[in-house]
């Protein structure tokens, strides 16, 4: 058995109530809270069960770059979790690093390409009013 005494799991509380109190986040799905988490500078440990979620390859690629741990099976997640604790905590204090924001821009904020606006502009060009 491993000793995870330095890990505290929050109960069932609203994410925004604890987002500024955490040193890192563990989540198990690519759902709405993930978009809030990628907007922070904090490490994210993400477990995406392949049996329940199918990510497009670009989302998977960007999440692998953004997350401190990205895994699609329990064993890989626990291995990544152990490595994270060894490398991101020094003398009981979390160590933060740079984060890759491409997932946030491409899947959250958009990269400047607005499909709805594009189709409206195309239609306006074609229908000369």
Residue spans for each PLM region:
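Active-site donor-binding acidic/aromatic loop of nucleotide-activated sugar
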Residues: 5-12
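Residues at or immediately preceding the N-termini of alpha-helices
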Residues: 15, 74-75, 116
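Short acidic alpha-helix that forms the nucleotide-activated donor recognition element
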Residues: 12-22
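Catalytic binding pocket for nucleotide-activated donors in carbohydrate/polymer assembly enzymes
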Residues: 1-4, 24, 29-110
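C-terminal alpha-helical cap of glycosyltransferases
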Residues: 108-129
